[in-house]
Amino acid sequence: MSGQETPREFTAQMSVRAGCWRLYVVLLNTTERWPEHCFGRPLPVPTFTERADALKALGFEPAPGAEWAWTEDTEKPDDPASAVVLIAATRVRSWTGAGQ
């Protein structure tokens, strides 16, 4: 064994809230504030490079082989006329010890 710790993996999610795309890393079992980045705009959707740069600024990087998955939700549950909300998620790993 090399003595190096394996980086912990987390889920990063991205959605539009309060008029801007926000990327955040979900830290479970902690009272710490989740690391978050606001892109400052509702459109266009942040590019892959912008998302990777935001993760890096938060101390994370995409996990090897991870891909972004997009899910559709609604603002008002059980209301078919409600506006659509897009949520993206991917696996990330900490390279700064965040969430430890």
Each PLM stretch: what is its role?
Residues 9, 51, 85-86:
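Short, intrinsically disordered, low-complexity terminal segments
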Residues 17-33:
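Short aromatic-glycine-(Arg/Gly/Cys) micro-motifs in beta-strand/loop hairpins
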Residues 61-100:
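Short, mixed-charge low-complexity intrinsically disordered segments
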Residues 1-21, 94-99:
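Short N-terminal "domain-start" leader segments
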Residues 31-46:
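A short, exposed loop/beta-hairpin motif centered on an aromatic-Gly-Thr core
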Residues 46-63:
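A short, charged, amphipathic alpha-helix used as a generic interaction element across diverse proteins
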